[in-house]
């Protein structure tokens, strides 16, 4: 593990500390019931994320780094574009499956009857993260670990700010619903839904961040991609990138 990767992991460890702070802040706001609704939905979301693209940046970075070293810039460009198309399709499929099947885990396994609405809000974040993973994988193939590290910190910062904003909006509405239906748990549930909205919008902002960095490096990349042509087919590229991923899942 080189020094750049060590630095990236250290920054990501700091993002985990921020995540714990976020959990504490939101837990104080929505209580045990609301935190339970949110935790169950996030757990199901994480399961689908592991199955779609969690390991892609590291795998893609290692696979493309060797091709960059051999000057196969056209091959790298084709593989990146093909992987983007594949991840878009996989992200859409994962989102649909998470929204349509995730409620079974929530309501039948975890026995959380109101968690489905939270999961439906979170599910589109799968699609956003799948796209992010391709950009981050390409940055790592260029030897740049900082976009992955910085994005992990920004995700928690955005999540805290947006989560608090939408927590207040949704919780106020939940209080009205609770008074109308005489069910106190609706306040916690709607508060958790607001936090989920903040989480989803955080992924949008992180995607915009990595895309801006990607666009900023396009000029130099186009010059490099005029080099050696690649000969790998689309199917061989997918096998190269995806088959080794199973070992980490």
Task: Annotate each PLM feature.
Residues 1-21, 119, 123, 146-150, ...:
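Hydrophobic faces of transmembrane alpha-helices in multi-pass small-molecule transporters and flippases
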Residues 2-58, 243-249:
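Signature of the first transmembrane helix
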Residues 12, 16, 43-46, 82, ...:
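Residue-level recognition of pore/gate-forming positions within transmembrane alpha-helices
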Residues 100, 111-135, 161-162:
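Alpha-helical transmembrane segments of multi-pass membrane proteins
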Residues 129-152:
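Membrane-interface junctions at transmembrane-helix termini in multi-pass inner-membrane proteins
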Residues 151-165, 169-220:
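Hydrophobic alpha-helical transmembrane segments
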């Amino acid at each position: 593990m080189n020094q750049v990767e060590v630095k990236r992991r250290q920054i990501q460890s700091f993002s985990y500390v921020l995540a714990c702070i976020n959990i504490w802040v939101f837990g104080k706001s929505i209580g045990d019931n609301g935190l339970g609704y949110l935790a169950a939905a996030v757990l199901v979301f994480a399961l689908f994320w592991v199955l779609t693209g969690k390991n892609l940046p590291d795998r893609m970075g290692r696979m493309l780094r060797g091709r960059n070293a051999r000057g196969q810039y056209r091959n790298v460009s084709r593989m990146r574009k093909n992987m983007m198309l594949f991840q878009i399709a996989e992200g859409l499929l994962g989102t649909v499956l998470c929204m349509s099947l995730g409620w079974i885990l929530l309501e039948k396994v975890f026995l959380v009857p109101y968690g489905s609405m939270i999961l439906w809000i979170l599910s589109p974040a799968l699609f956003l993260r799948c796209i992010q993973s391709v950009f981050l994988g390409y940055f790592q193939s260029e030897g740049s670990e900082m976009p992955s590290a910085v994005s992990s910190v920004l995700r928690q910062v955005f999540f805290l700010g947006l989560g608090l904003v939408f927590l207040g909006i949704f919780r106020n509405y939940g209080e009205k619903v609770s008074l109308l239906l005489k069910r106190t748990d609706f306040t916690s549930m709607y508060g958790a839904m607001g936090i989920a909205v903040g989480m989803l919008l955080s992924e949008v902002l992180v995607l915009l961040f990595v895309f801006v960095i990607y666009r900023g490096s396009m000029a130099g990349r186009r010059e490099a991609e005029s080099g050696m042509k690649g000969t790998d087919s689309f199917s061989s590229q997918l096998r190269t990138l995806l088959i080794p991923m199973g070992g980490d899942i």
